[in-house]
Amino acid sequence: FDTWWLSAQSAFRQNGTAVASIAMRARNRIYVRGYDELLLPHLAEALNSNPGCRKLIVLHLTGSHEPVCSNWPRDKAVFKPLDTEEVCYDNSIHYTDSLLGQVFAMLETRRASVMYFSDHGLEYDPTKEHVYFHGGIKPSQQAYHVPMFIWYSPTLGEHVDRQTVNSVFSTAYNDYLINAWMGVTRPAQPKTPEEVITRWQGKSDVFDANHNVFNYKALRNSFK
């Protein structure tokens, strides 16, 4: 694979983190200052480089990370008035959705697939000054609610199995899922995304910022 790491989060911010160690292994690394959409020209560059070479391209987005009102352009607002973090959060989701639509359009005629997921969720407490925040300590289930899906280009046709997973699936098993999705096989590990999901769906152990392990199903539903 020709590997690309395209990030809207600064390299300095990631120094010394697990994310930085992963990013440093990519053959090509590009960091931008600004909104997530600034990554799209670099995605086009990556797609058009080395024709015929298989590629793994990581788009490291800011998304709806707090401070949520700062992470998307105000001229893209569809929900108004912009006077609460709740409205900013809704607009940030719409902005990311629009961005993903542009990514899919760039890949529509290619033999390509996209795996999308967030690394963590956000807690919500309307009584706080900043109503969205990390659930690092004493988390509720909200802290672990993240979007995740695999999209396949129409050019792949009937070569993929499309389904919806209607049970808990932890991103703790994404290492196995990504391997299977990319066609990387290892002894005694599932060989397809469907096999990974079948083996680990319903598993509900999670951990917090202090590496304390909890049963997700035993956590309270929300922070407040």
Feature map (PLM): residue ranges:
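Alpha-helical scaffolding within the catalytic cores
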Residues: 41-45, 132-137
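Membrane-interface soluble catalytic domains
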Residues: 105-107, 128, 137-139, 150-224
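Short glycine/proline- and charge-enriched loop/turn segments
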Residues: 20-27, 74-84, 130-135, 156-159
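Hydrophobic/aromatic residues located in beta-strands of well-ordered beta-sheets
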Residues: 3, 114-116, 148
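Metal-dependent active-site segment of extracytoplasmic phospho-/sulfohydrolases and closely related
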Residues: 95-133, 175-182
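Active-site-proximal alpha/beta segments of enzymes that process anionic O-linked groups
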Residues: 1-77, 145, 171, 176-202
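Aromatic-acidic/polar surface patches that form glycan- and anion
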Residues: 32-36, 85, 89-96, 163-171
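Active-site-proximal cap/lid insertion segments
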Residues: 11-15, 62-110, 128, 136-147
